[in-house]
Amino acid sequence: MKAMVMERAGEPLRAAELPVPKPRPRQILIKVAACGVCRTDLHVFDGELQHPKLPLVLGHEIVGHIEALGEDVEGFAVGERVGVPWLGFTDGTCFYCRAGRENLCDHPLFTGYQIDGGYAQYTVADARYVFPIPEGYSDAEAAPLLCAGLIGYRSLKMTGNVPVGAPSRLGIYGFGAAAHIVAQVARHEARQIYAFTRAGDAKAQEFARELGAVWVGSSDEMPPDPLDAAIIFAPVGSLVPAALRAVRKAGVVVCGGIHMSDIPSFPYEILWEERVVRSVANLTRDDAREFLALAPKVPVKTTVVPMPLASANEALQRLRQGELTGAAVLIP
């Protein structure tokens, strides 16, 4: 099979011919139809997420069709369209798994990091972390739902319930793949969107307006109204104190990325009055089931830039440079 292989952090991915993997017990072999390019891929590629499996096939926003079932797999059929997200394995026995918080498992394995992912024509996945894809989406359109959508959805849940009797104002810092999905779900919940982008990023600001943002500005600006909550998708630690200054008393700031530059020190007064800063880690299977059922009801519409598998290096660089509106998706 064709694959784009990472041999060392920071070096261009290499086009390679690899054997088609065989599913072990409780695994599913999937013929990949599309794989989204996520900022987490860039963190792995750059070595910011250390100790990946090497050589490695990146990619964890995988959509494809079941080619074969390993032993002891139930509830799936050959030919069914399915998706594979970032969290690819949990031990099921640690304190967190037993407490229903498998996203914090002590011994997890992640797709496209410790398990070969979807920058290839085929992949295998643990059947527990394979999910049916809803109708109404092409393969490419569905791919960003598997991480940008799922992590965005979990981030939104962690901002808390929408206040009753007053407009709920949600700030989103960094308006890329995850933000464009979260904005649609938040508006479905009658939240008002305040979008923060890089200074001068007219393309991202116009994209936010198209998705219904009531205010758009640069990340170093204060919004005209105090926010009830903020989600930070940009991997920039200095945005944490900026967001704390923007939220009202008891406001919640959620850091929605897996990696962030160092957070600078800040005065206690901007955290005081019961403001909260929290991070998001991975996803649960319940998150996936809830969001994939909700997405077509909103309906969430993804904006994608399809690219051939051989253009994986170009896709990563365009993501790095902020040149994408929506999400790049590789087509094997």
Where are these predicted regions, by residue range?
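Cytochrome P450 core scaffold surrounding the K-helix E-X-X-R motif
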Residues: 40-43
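Structural detector of well-ordered beta-strand residues that form the stable sheet scaffold
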Residues: 63, 83, 131, 171, ...
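Mid-domain Rossmann-like dinucleotide-binding core that forms the NAD(H)/NADP(H) cofactor-binding site
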Residues: 82, 135-220
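NAD(P)H dinucleotide-binding glycine-rich loop of Rossmann-like/cofactor-binding domains
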Residues: 90-173
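Glycine-rich cofactor phosphate-binding loops and adjacent beta1-alpha1 units
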Residues: 161-170, 194, 202-276
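C-terminal hydrophobic helical "lid"/dimerization subdomain
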Residues: 241, 285-332
